[in-house]
Amino acid sequence: MRLILWLPVLVVVLLMVLEGPAPAQGAPAIASTFSNIPNSLKEFGNNLKDAFESIPEATRKLMTSFAEGLKNLRLPLL
């Protein structure tokens, strides 16, 4: 009885194994990859520049909010 149940499963597995590996996906042309590198580097540089330019303003806001918090803090006298 078990042989009858396992026979279709064995046939399907055998067919999958004999089919072989799936075909590889086509790789993009290497020339187009090399031509996109300068644009990618320029975009990365612009993003990095924008990030570094925003650091002083963010630090200023953080320090201002910290100073305001200290001004509003009321400590009881001991």
Curated annotation (Swiss-Prot):
Its main location: secreted. GO terms for molecular function: fatty acid binding; phospholipase inhibitor activity. GO terms for cellular component: high-density lipoprotein particle; very-low-density lipoprotein particle. The keyword Transport applies. Residues 1-26 form the signal peptide. Keywords: Lipid transport, Secreted, Signal, Transport, VLDL. One of its GO terms (biological process) is very-low-density lipoprotein particle clearance. Disulfide bonds: none annotated. The keyword Transport applies. It is found in: Secreted. Inhibitor of lipoprotein binding to the low density lipoprotein (LDL) receptor, LDL receptor-related protein, and very low density lipoprotein (VLDL) receptor. Associates with high density lipoproteins (HDL) and the triacylglycerol-rich lipoproteins in the plasma and makes up about 10% of the protein of the VLDL and 2% of that of HDL. Appears to interfere directly with fatty acid uptake and is also the major plasma inhibitor of cholesteryl ester transfer protein (CETP). Binds free fatty acids and reduces their intracellular esterification. Belongs to the apolipoprotein C1 family. This is Apolipoprotein C-I. It comes from Felis catus (Cat). The lineage of its organism: Eukaryota, Metazoa, Chordata, Craniata, Vertebrata.
